[in-house]
A protein has these predicted regions:
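Conserved phosphate-binding/catalytic loops and adjacent sensor/switch elements of nucleotide-binding enzymes
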Residues: 20-21, 29, 33, 59, ...
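C-terminal non-catalytic interaction modules
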Residues: 1-29, 34, 55, 347, ...
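Extended alpha-helical scaffolding segments used for macromolecular assembly and cargo binding
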Residues: 55, 72, 305, 344-432, ...
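Internal alpha-solenoid helical repeat scaffolds
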Residues: 75-79, 157, 176, 181-183, ...
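Alpha-helical sensor/transducer elements of the RecA-like P-loop NTPase core
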Residues: 68, 121, 148, 152-216, ...
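N-terminal pre-P-loop "Q-motif" helix
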Residues: 30-46
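Short secondary-structure boundary elements
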Residues: 62, 203, 207, 211, ...
């Protein structure tokens, strides 16, 4: 591995490249860059071989693979080209002939008398070695070339003895003579850029040999900044540590990426670190421990000149926000420097940083709190209780549950912050998908401690308890009674002497109301709360709580989408979206809005918009483990499945399963199995569909209603697709249950899935449900119900067009198949051909039709189709005969059959039907 390509400067004085080592991972070290750089190597070869070129200079930032591209370009020439690989000495070194030392050692004594003699001697030696072949020299680190070596190389180029491939970060780093050759066009420049996120994904998949989730690729891309060489080092280290594992057929991380430098990465970092001034090293040490610091605080510790120089060199990054937060330019650098630092050194640096006293807590941002807490834990020191609570709360806000547990774990029952700390611990456990542990954390708070809480603290504690109980089968039904008792307690507080603050009591009451709305939404029982929820979401009077109104509105829009009011739900969603900017400070409100909006859009048939909405959720998910990437992958896959595009759903679904199988996630795994079974069924892979269906059946457990209802639907649809005779009845029963609870949207979707082979009664029920709903999906359901009941091909073709408008491929195929059968039965040739053409256009995206036409054979034979296509394009009968190799009379006979079968009378009508 070229250390120069990764360093802040040139750290090796090696005169020839070392042997390539085998990486810890499945691909050789330089192979990683090669996977991304083959096209660049070809560009270098092309430029090098141009008639007017003396050579090529490869430029780019450290770590982009300049040396690798040069070596790959050389290796492509084969034995007919003589190649030499040279490397200049480090910067600041004036070693004469540094890169040519090995060649210099071979010269006879008579050729060492003067620079001119050396120049001629080296030129003759290289010509002799080339033995008449063309010669190409690869010069690594050309920016540090000494003057005498420059003269020799220029002579080799000018005399056409050799051509040159040189590497440098910038053309301005080159010796002046080489820079002049570039400006005159005699040396070409090939500029390398860092890998994009998509290229990182492609390299990982090629190198590791299996699926890699987009979330993992994104995480690694951000970590290494698109450097293929660093990417290999990080991946190899994570595989060696057992953190990056192959789960099923997908590579996934078991935990966050922590770099301890056990591979070549530490050598790279130590070499870079050793080159810095003592003051710059201390800045690196401080930022390694602190992770991030405001520029104002860093400037109180170090001179502005040092900070400015480090920013200019890219060693630190200062963001452009109001606080100007400073971080290291490369995150991996901080991880490794921190790892080798002693505890005493960490403590010494922590005491130097101002702004961490307890009375300054209110002045710290969320990021400051987390950074200070992490630094303290790195020092094996205890956080003060107030700091621990604040840091735990901040970690929960940023979805970093493991760190929240670490912070809250330092509190003891004797601390005044104990009850609130257990509240944060419970929230963290829920984020990890561990409701039993979350409930246990709250149970550890004594009744006396609960009673000592003020009104708002008490309400928040009860709300947290209700959130946990909803997940536990034996306690979920007790939530309404818990809330009733809590309201009685608040009423008692209002009668105390002195009474509690009325404003605080009002806020506590709203907290319990919101908790109740969330509970009913969790269990899918919308009717009992709709009136109160609507009032809470729409009441806008002086003195009302706008945040409570906004949170209630977010729950309401999902409730509306479930109960048949899809258009109202989407209207409310747009209104809320326009208000969110004012409330960006409210914890996790954007994520809550985005995920409930996803459900609104998905149930409205707008699956593309649902996927787009996830970008907001995943982009803001926080700093924690994978930032919810498994949930995002699952939701994307589910949207594709609902759209009937199983072939597109499999990659994100399998990536989600790989992540969910290695960690608990509130029963999302069961939903992932069910959706994957449905996706495989849609692609016609009945074996895999059955396997994942069995896994879904065995992965039982509590789940949010939106998840459990979707899971059951996917399982029943997969079963129906596989020919399970009982699947239809299960879907009908599910639809009836939803209907009785007022969930008309879900009822309509279930009955629609059941009526692929429905009865008149089923279609009447579907039509009734469509009348209770809003939006294009409801209208399409109504059209399908009427067309299926009347066996009307024209109506079914209309339904197919409606499905095409929503891009619901499987539904469109279903409508087209039925339209084909109805048209054939009624002798409507044109309609039958229109339906058949539609089915053919869907053959790739829907390989396994939800319903097969009774007449499976094509309307035209293969020869008839070939002739009809040529005729429709204006080819004469004579030319068709020559093209196909038959007589003109036979062509005329085939065309007669085509016109008869398709019901057309002119050639111009053929193209639209074939």
């Amino acid at each position: 591995m070229s250390r120069d390509s990764l360093g802040w400067g040139n750290v090796s004085t090696t005169l020839a490249p070392a042997e390539e080592e085998q990486a810890a991972g499945p691909v050789a070290r330089h192979g990683w860059s090669g996977l991304a750089r083959n096209a660049d190597a070809e560009r270098v070869r092309t430029e090098l071989l141009a008639q007017d070129r003396m050579g090529v200079v490869i430029t780019g930032d450290r770590g982009v693979g300049k040396t690798l591209v040069g070596r790959t370009a050389l290796s492509g020439f084969g034995p007919e080209v003589y190649t030499i690989q040279l490397r200049s000495t480090g910067p600041g070194s004036a070693t004469p002939y540094g890169c040519l030392a090995f060649t210099l050692a071979r010269l006879p004594q008579s050729s060492l008398g003067s620079p001119t003699a050396i120049l001629h001697g080296i030129t003759s030696l290289i010509r002799d070695d080339a033995a008449g072949r063309q010669c190409v020299i690869l010069l690594d680190n050309a920016g540090a070339l000494d003057e005498l070596s420059t003269g020799v190389l220029l002579n080799l180029l000018q005399t056409r003895t050799a051509r040159l491939i040189a590497t440098a970060q910038r053309t301005t780093d080159l010796p002046p003579d080489f820079y002049w050759l570039i400006t005159s066009g005699q040396l070409a420049e090939v500029r390398l850029a860092n890998l994009t996120e998509l290229e990182t994904l492609e390299v990982l998949q090629s190198a590791l040999g299996h699926r890699v989730s987009t979330a993992l690729a994104s995480q690694l891309h951000q970590l290494v900044g698109g450097s293929p060489t660093l990417l290999q080092a990080v991946v190899s280290e994570q595989i060696e540590r057992g953190n990056l594992v192959l789960s099923g057929s997908v590579w996934t991380l078991l935990d966050e990426v922590v770099l301890d430098g056990r591979t070549a990465l530490e050598d790279i970092v130590r070499a870079r670190y050793a080159r810095e001034t003592p003051e710059a090293r201390e800045v690196i040490d401080v930022l390694s421990c602190a992770r991030t610091l405001p520029l104002s605080r860093l400037a109180r510790m170090y001179s502005p000149g040092v900070i400015a120089d480090m920013e200019e060199a890219g060693q630190i990054v200062v963001d452009r926000t109001d606080r100007h937060l400073v971080t290291l330019g490369d995150r991996y650098l901080g991880d490794i420097v921190r790892n080798w630092m002693s505890v005493e050194r960490r403590l010494e640096l922590r005491d130097k940083v101002p702004g961490h006293q307890e009375h300054e807590l209110d002045e710290l941002t969320v990021e400051d709190l987390l950074a200070y807490a992490a630094w303290t834990h790195d020092c094996h020191a205890q956080l003060a209780p107030a700091h621990a609570l604040a840091a735990a709360s901040a970690a929960v806000r940023l979805f970093d549950p493991k760190f929240a547990l670490k912070c809250a774990g330092s509190l003891s029952p004797s601390d005044a912050e104990w009850a609130e700390g257990q509240l944060q611990k419970s929230a963290a456990y829920l984020q990890l998908g561990l409701p039993l542990q979350a409930m246990s954390a709250l149970d550890d708070v004594s009744d006396q401690q609960v009673n000592e809480l003020a009104a708002e603290g008490f309400a928040e504690f009860i709300a947290a308890k209700a959130d946990c109980m909803a997940w536990l089968e034996d306690r979920s039904g007790k939530v309404p009674e818990l809330l009733r008792q809590a309201r009685i307690r608040l009423q008692d507080l209002s009668l105390d002497d002195p009474p509690a603050d009325p404003a605080a009591l009002s806020r506590a009451g709203l907290c319990l109301d919101l908790c109740e709305f969330n509970y009913f939404s969790f269990i899918g029982d919308f009717e009992p709360m709709m009136e109160r929820l609507t009032a809470a979401a729409t009441t806008d009077v002086p003195g009302s709580d706008p945040v409570h109104r906004l949170r209630s509105a977010i729950i309401l829009m999902e409730a509306l989408s479930m109960t048949g009011r899809e258009l109202d739900a989407r209207k409310l969603m747009r209104e809320i979206g326009g208000q969110l900017g004012e409330w960006s400070n409210v914890p996790r409100i954007r994520e809550n809005f985005a995920w409930r909006s996803y459900n609104v859009l998905l149930l409205s048939g707008l699956w593309r918009q649902a996927i787009d909405m996830l970008k907001d959720a995943s982009g803001r998910a926080g700093h924690g483990l994978h930032s919810g990437s498994a949930a995002t992958d699952l939701a994307v896959g589910l949207a594709y499945v609902y759209a009937g595009r199983g072939y597109m759903a499999l990659d994100p679904l399998l990536a989600a399963i790989a992540q969910l199988e290695v960690r608990a996630s509130l029963q999302s795994l069961r939903q992932a199995y069910a959706a994957t079974a449905f996706a495989y069924a849609q692609t016609g892979n009945s074996v895999q569909a059955a396997i994942y269906l069995d896994r879904a059946r065995s992965a039982d457990g509590p789940a949010r209603f939106a998840v459990s209802s979707s899971t059951e639907f996917c399982m029943d649809m997969a079963s129906r697709w596989l020919g399970d005779p009982e699947a239809k009845d299960r879907l009908i029963r599910a639809g009836e249950a939803h209907f009785r609870k007022g969930r008309y949207t879900l009822a309509g979707i279930c009955v629609f899935g059941a009526t692929v082979n429905g009865t008149v009664k089923d279609f009447l029920f579907l039509e009734e449900l469509a009348g209770l709903r809003q939006g294009p999906l409801a209208e399409m359901s109504r059209t399908v119900a009427i067309g299926s009941r009347k066996k009307d091909a024209a109506i079914m073709l209309e339904a197919a067009e409606q499905a095409a408008g929503l891009e619901l491929d499987a539904v469109q195929a279903r409508c087209a198949a039925l339209a084909f059968d109805f048209a054939k039965g009624a002798g409507l040739t044109a309609s039958a051909n229109a339906a058949y053409s539609m089915l053919e256009s869907l053959s790739e995206s829907v390989p396994a039709l939800p319903i097969m036409p009774r007449n499976k054979g094509p309307l035209l034979t293969e020869r008839e189709r070939q002739i009809a296509t040529l005729a429709g394009n204006g080819v004469s009968n004579k030319d068709i005969a020559l093209e196909v190799g038959i007589s003109v009379r036979t062509v005329e006979g085939h065309l007669y059959q085509v016109f008869t079968k398709l019901g057309v009378s002119s050639r111009s009508d053929l193209l639209g039907l074939i």
